[in-house]
């Protein structure tokens, strides 16, 4: 009898031990945010703020051609660390310095992969890390959010993967978002109707497509990605038509970290503006020499259709030399170091080496130098792709920068073009 009791107690202890191993918690440095991770058929996680559960039963997986990472995960070990440091951006956008404090949990699994979680005082993030010797094909990624109740969603919904990211935002209850509705680009903003707002976004995107989100019709949000384009056809002066796609979303190095999926969790809208999560999660700068980078304000004629008006406009306004000298004078008067010349400075959009004679770019560069105002030129990405030596040529002319436009895609090929 004692033998059976002992075996029963041993079995109970074993079960409780397994459950304890399969439930893992990570707290933010201030203890306000908690990530609860469970390992079963998938990797699940909940997010709580001040004991209020804001995200529940979310799951994550990465499907490769040969295997699915995160499916029936087998934990081989875990490592924790805490970081408290100050980051100094080369080009400050919001702050001259950024406090970067977080607690990190690295979960190592069998089959050559890990999942890394970070908990900040204003949000959480996770990413996959793989350790394969050969290149891998990524078939898809499962980013799944199960909302505990009806939330208000703020979405930008394009017609498809080809988008200029200029659609107006929709503001809809999460239960009203149908699978047949348009998907959303990132970021999306989730209003819990209670204490918190959650900004969902990604960071450190490299050699991988952008993530889009859609509804499954059950108050859940899932991920969808553009596939790798294999063949292109002509589609005007600033675009290519995708004629053939692969059955995978990325073909990439097998030993790498994947993009961060992050949630900025705030109580007040103003803290969304102050959010620096994208910068804090970005890979370290790879440039050795950054002395040539000169950030500054720019005057851009596209906003007003290149047609200035007023008592001081004593010339025929338009895409011509007099109008752009007027813009240079305006910039010089108000201490703006750059003007941006949009479409029209070149004779055609496909020839970046022949300036529009009505504009006289070389005279404008000379005139701008007299006024301490430099010039940035607009170009379509397709023109840049076909004329990569133009950077050297325009630099020799005295042009200080290029605004590359109309990418309108975010598949792996185009993301690599960004880099």
What residue ranges belong to the model's regions?
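Bacterial Sec-dependent N-terminal signal peptides
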Residues: 1-23
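N-terminal accessory beta-strand-rich subdomains and adjacent acidic, glycine-rich linkers
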Residues: 23-285
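Conserved, mostly hydrophobic/aromatic
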Residues: 128, 331, 405
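Intrinsically disordered, low-complexity acidic regions
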Residues: 242-244, 279, 325, 343-347, ...
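An acidic-aromatic substrate-binding cleft motif
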Residues: 249, 253-330, 334
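Sec-exported extracytoplasmic/periplasmic mature domains
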Residues: 329-336, 369-370, 395
